[in-house]
Amino acid sequence: MKARNILFLILASLLLCTAVSAAEYTDVSDAHWAYKQINYLDAEITGYPDGTYKPENTVTRAEFLTLFARIAFQEEWKQAESDDWWKAAYSVCIAHDLLDGINGGRVNAMPRSEIAALLDRFCSGWGGVHERADAANQLNINWTEQRMESPEWQPLFPDAAEYGNSVLISANQGLLTGYPDGSFKPEKGVTRAEAAAILARLKAQLALREKGCEYVCTVGDYWLMQYPASGSVGLALYEPLTGKLVQTVGLWKAAQGVNGYVAFDRLLSGSDGIYVWGRAGL
């Protein structure tokens, strides 16, 4: 058991030590689906001594929570005193009441349902998060019989219904996505590539929030964000990882011609704004 723990500490340190860019990994080409996300996290995540990133390796609870804490609570994580590399992250997350229901061993894979619960709690204070989820859920209920015009529409993640709103909220916030078959696979762990994608979205949204932007939905390769305009509220499309403004969108206008996507298929009223749910690449 002692030897196993030592091995775990060695492997974990490889995930969290000196950072390099994705371009330097021999097993992550620029054609890899998570190349940009891995590169975006070059200050938080790293690879192995042999120059690989091992994108298909599964991430443990301790590893995911440490990376999460470094992004979500950077200064607190730096100041937290700990004898072990993973304890600072746990201490910070516990201080923010984020670990209720996350009781599995730290050396085990962190299932997607727990990641959803963690992100749900973390985002609970953000404006419109729960309203978007409620609106989307109501749409699913109301349109079970009356289908959307798009034949591709279906209720969000049927295999995650028992996990309450946490999966719905995390997905509606643009932080978690499902699989091509429409499933969420709540008990499945995440790979290093998937963890990078999830945490890159979180880091990017935190950066945009510092500019006063609120996430609305994903439109193709872009995020539709609500931003403060002079005397009103505006909508605009942003590149997620660069934060670059792509196109402004009026509140009541459809944004067309951006990668062939239409920003608005349906407009839903939330308690603090207008929320989008429908075809729009969601």
PLM regions and their residue ranges:
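N-terminal propeptides
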Residues: 9, 17-212
